[in-house]
């Protein structure tokens, strides 16, 4: 339940000192525009309803919103590289994968397997402290070695097939565990780049 609420997610990261953004606060706490921020729904997933507020005029227009449903989060510009990660915990089994990605309209179309001990350690810490039983999607950005986790989604993400093809088969492991109590073995993840494309087919 913690990760269904983006402000609770921020508080969890802050409390446990795990690469949290500078701020993720209810919109109604901001009385005057000062610096750019991302506008997000407090509850929700994906990039739907995200908007960059970078002028006083845009901020003024937010008066129309039900502010208790919205939040402001630190803005990351294009200097930051974006990563999508998955961590899975089933009984004593914990494993994770880190993918550097490129987006098109909010969807990952390119991903590259990355080895980063700091991120892997943080993912394990999140899984252990939250007493995870299943899979989490963790999104973060990095610039000048500064890591910032801006989203944690308690669900299978749209990169599930990419991960599967790379050897990280969290969806299958999850199903096998809950149906058959089968504990996965440590995966051999392919150190590859992967591209998602659309195909045209006759119907």
Language-model segments: residues:
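ATP-dependent carboxylate/phosphate-activation module, predominantly the ATP-grasp catalytic core
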Residues: 54-57, 67-69, 74-131, 135, ...
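Protein kinase-like catalytic core scaffold
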Residues: 37, 94-95, 148-151
